[in-house]
UniProtKB/Swiss-Prot annotation:
Reported phenotype of the disruption mutant: Knockout mice show no overt abnormalities, however male mice show reduced fertility. Reduced length of spermatozoa tails and significantly lower motility. Reduced ability to penetrate the zona pellucida likely due to impaired sperm motility. Spermatozoa show disorganized fibrous sheath, loss of thickening of the longitudinal columns adjacent to doublet microtubules 3 and 8, additionally ribs that circumferentially connect longitudinal columns are torn, this phenotype is first evident in step 16 spermatids.
Pfam families named among the record's database cross-references: IIGP
Binding annotation for GTP: 60-67, 85-89, 215-217
The protein's role, per its UniProt record: Required for sperm motility and therefore male fertility, via positive regulation of spermatozoa fibrous sheath formation.
PANTHER family cross-referenced by the UniProt entry: INTERFERON-INDUCIBLE GTPASE (PTHR32341), INTERFERON-INDUCIBLE GTPASE 5 (PTHR32341:SF10)
GO biological process, alphabetically ordered: positive regulation of flagellated sperm motility
Protein name in the entry: Interferon-inducible GTPase 5
Family annotation (InterPro entries): G_IRG_dom, Immunity-related_GTPase-like, IRG, P-loop_NTPase
Gene Ontology CC entries for this record: lipid droplet; membrane; sperm flagellum; sperm mitochondrial sheath
Subcellular location, record wording: Cell projection, Cilium, Flagellum; Lipid droplet
């Protein structure tokens, strides 16, 4: 049976790292201590994979905060671990809801403004304001008078990152005949509500607020994709990895962003692989490299939503059968990644080591000049990273096929 040719890895791939990461690696390489450098690289990789992200979700009582949290976590109200929902305020104290697939990301359901036992003047202290990396402020319907704690609005006005969401605006949607065709009327209504919310927040002292009109029941429509993009943009660089992976795959653009970010992570992993090879311990490099590759491939499988639960939820959202979506997936990562899968991928890789080595030298040029041994090991061993780079494209392409099959139409 013929083996399909793997897509080539681009020649101009570069390892992107934060300034502090580069300085730490420079110090480790200059010391000439291989075990120290290997330990430092493993630490940097682990930190990027386990960075915590805390998101506070607050707003008016009964505004739909819990439903929005469930939508962002890809859960329905009846799913195990879902946030409690109801027509009245159900949150009396900050309640953490870890992401079901990425436990380092936690969305906090905060008490609504005006809820019993939560006074407006002490709101920041009661919800532990400093805990959160940024806020989602939820307001129902037309945003009214934006009934949010003044202290919270003032803190946001001073630069605290936040986004306002209106998840229940669809309840006021009625396409009057006088406004023309349905699509035109809906677009006009969307803009009217955005303008109204913007003006109310400016009156409250918030300059240039971001407004997103979303539907908790239809996370693929309206402003939800723009909310996802803003989430990624607002996160600090060191928390972007966790934040982006945790977001639901609600568009082809979201899938592409995940692929780009994971591609950078692959090349960081290549550094670890190359330095481990330089350690004088027989068999260590091969064993570590295999384990690292298996973990990476399993991460891609989970991140792109190719597991059964994720496909079932996506099918439910768009009114399709899960089997129809799975039928278009052609990735070997559509099933659980095993050591046998890794061996098969290794056998299909022939020229990855030199390309990863070139990316290694472009990202950390000090290694080639100051530590020839590590540079040589980077050329000879990271075949697994070439496998990762190539097969990272495969699940990304597979994950996009269900979206293309759905072919959503109308106003997004």
């Amino acid at each position: 049976m013929a083996t399909s040719r793997l897509p080539a890895v681009p020649e101009e791939t570069t390892i992107l790292m934060a300034k502090e990461e580069l300085e730490a690696l420079r110090t480790a390489f200059e010391s000439g201590d291989i075990p120290q450098a290997a330990s430092r690289l493993r630490e940097l990789l682990a930190n990027s994979e386990t960075t915590r992200l805390e998101v506070g979700v607050t707003g008016e009582s009964g505004a739909g905060k819990s439903s929005l949290i469930n939508a962002l976590r890809g859960l329905g109200a009846e799913d195990p671990g879902a946030a409690l929902t109801g027509v009245v305020e159900t949150t009396m104290q900050p309640s953490p809801y870890p992401h079901p697939q990425f436990p380092d990301v936690t969305l906090w359901d905060l008490p609504g403004a005006g809820s019993p036992g939560c006074s407006a003047d002490k709101y920041l202290k009661q919800v532990d304001f400093g805990r959160y990396d940024f806020f989602l402020l939820v307001s129902p319907r037309r945003c009214g008078a934006v009934e949010l704690p003044p202290s919270l609005l003032r803190s946001c006005a001073r630069g605290r990152s936040f986004t306002l969401c209106a998840p229940r605006w669809t309840r006021i949607w009625r396409p009057p005949a006088a406004r023309g065709p349905r699509v035109s009327a809906r677009l006009q209504l969307l803009q009217e509500i955005r303008d109204h919310c913007t003006e109310r927040l400016r009156v409250a002292g918030v300059n240039d607020p971001r407004i997103f009109l979303v539907s908790n029941l239809s996370p693929t429509r309206y402003d939800f994709p723009m909310l996802v993009t803003t989430w990624e943009h607002d996160l600090p660089a060191h928390r972007r990895h966790a934040g982006l992976l945790s977001l639901p795959d609600i568009s082809l653009e979201a899938l592409q962003k995940k692929k780009d970010m994971l591609q950078e992570q692959v090349l960081k992993t290549a550094l670890v692989s190359g330095v481990i090879q330089a350690l004088p311990v027989p068999g260590l490099a091969a064993a570590y490299d295999d384990a690292l590759l298996i973990r990476s491939l399993r991460g891609y499988h989970r991140s792109f939503g190719l597991d059964d639960d994720s496909l079932a939820k996506l099918a439910e959202q768009v009114g399709k059968q899960a089997g129809d979506l799975r039928s278009v997936i052609r990735s070997p990562l559509a099933n659980e990644v095993s050591p046998e899968t890794v061996l098969r991928l290794y056998s299909q890789s022939s020229d990855g080591a030199m390309r990863v080595a070139r990316a290694f030298e472009r990202g950390i040029p000090v290694s080639a000049r100051w530590w020839p041994g590590v540079s040589a090991s980077a050329r000879s061993t990271p075949c697994s990273r070439a496998v990762s780079m190539r097969w990272l494209r495969t699940p990304n392409a597979s994950a996009s096929k269900p979206w293309r099959k759905m072919s959503p139409r109308g106003v997004r």
